Amino acid sequence: MKRGSLIGLLLAVALAALAALLPGGEAEPPVIGPAQVVDGDTLGVAGQRIRLHGVDAPEANQLCERGGQPWRCGADATEALRGLLAGRPVACTPVDRDRFGRIVARCAVEGQDLGAWLVGQGLAVAYTDYSWRYVPAEFWARWHGRGLWGGSFQTPAEHRRAQR
């Protein structure tokens, strides 16, 4: 490939990446209020169903292995999130909507990013199909054998595919 063509191609790719980062219109307002935990990565807040952005927690019925024994990792992720929230108000910043119409958002309780907390505890994986934001937290959890990383498991995406 000629140098000019390569530079043009790189410029086009860079511009496309930049365009993907620009907002596509009016941003949705924040969603704030008490949260009901639906599962390890889904909340109900102010009458809205919210999927946490950039994380993928085990499915509610998913089993993992820890210490050679089955572990209800999906149920534990849900309960741990419920315990963290403990009725405190959640503030969610919408990022997108998913194919089911749910708001996809970054949410926090008292300044604690829920996605970072879940991934750092090893209760969810960084969902790199959508964001690399939580990869450092996943690396930390892996390094320290936290949660999922203390045994063996199918990623939630693999588990969903296997259930079809």
Model regions and ranges:
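Small beta-barrel nucleic-acid-binding modules, primarily SNase/OB-fold domains
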Residues: 1-164
